[in-house]
Amino acid sequence: MTFTIMTDSTADLNQTWAEDHDIVLIGLTILCDGEVYETVGPNRISSDYLLKKMKAGSHPQTSQINVGEFEKVFREHARNNKALLYLAFSSVLSGTYQSALMARDLVREDYPDAVIEIVDTLAAAGGEGYLTILAAEARDSGKNLLETKDIVEAVIPRLRTYFLVDDLFHLMRGGRLSKGSAFLGSLASIKPLLWIDEEGKLVPIAKIRGRQKAIKEMVAQVEKDIADSTVIVSYTSDQGSAEKLREELLAHENISDVLMMPLGPVISAHVGPNTLAVFVIGQNSR
């Protein structure tokens, strides 16, 4: 039985790639300066446009996917007797996962045998994208839905996500980081390195003076535990630093490929300009 893989716009996957690999994308929305912007489809807002507005003083807000949007997609699949695997944006960072659970319950009232599996990835951006790529590879190699789900869920505890943010104000403003942590990042070029812990929370793990030293520390953190030879590097604005980070990672003997994946508008709204991120699968749980 074939099945659909779906994920959010927060996975930051290239939309052409997603279409080519039969991945359904469902989008969060962004409110900025009184306008509502889509993050999926031909009229989606670009990260560059949003970041320019943020540099000019705009404070965008993001909205989770509502129950009705999920219900529409789930009901269509149930009506056509097609199974669906949805890889959800972290439940710690958004209410989107809960909306999906509620929508599934509604659909199963009419279609009790509907096959709708929902995974809380506890991830965002390239991490969520990484898991979706693994799911697509598993499905395309002949794995069924439950086998694919098991593969993804086995990787989630070992997925390591590192963020280097130029200004923690945006994370604090959006409620993704405490005011105390954000204050530390505002002191005299101190650059906190953050990661997503085992509970899915975004927390500081190191405080480094200067951006270049912080990038080297990010590489050092990645080198501590590598299981998969593919690494994803994401960025906002500063592609040059991202390329340098890629080169440093490729110098490691256990890394054979580094995929470059620009951060999408939803994540950009929360981290701001000049952010770098690395996503890697380790041997051990976080």
Curated annotation (Swiss-Prot):
The species this protein was found in: Streptococcus pyogenes serotype M1
Coiled coil ranges: none
Keywords: Lipid-binding
SUPFAM superfamilies for this protein: DAK1/DegV-like (SSF82549)
Function: May bind long-chain fatty acids, such as palmitate, and may play a role in lipid transport or fatty acid metabolism.
Binding site for hexadecanoate: T62, S94
Molecular function as annotated in GO: lipid binding
Source taxon at top rank: Bacteria
One Pfam entry name: DegV
NCBIfam families, sorted: DegV
Protein name: DegV domain-containing protein SPy_1936/M5005_Spy1650
PANTHER family reported for this sequence: DEGV DOMAIN-CONTAINING PROTEIN DR_1986-RELATED (PTHR33434), FATTY ACID-BINDING PROTEIN TM_1468 (PTHR33434:SF2)
Domain DegV: 3-282
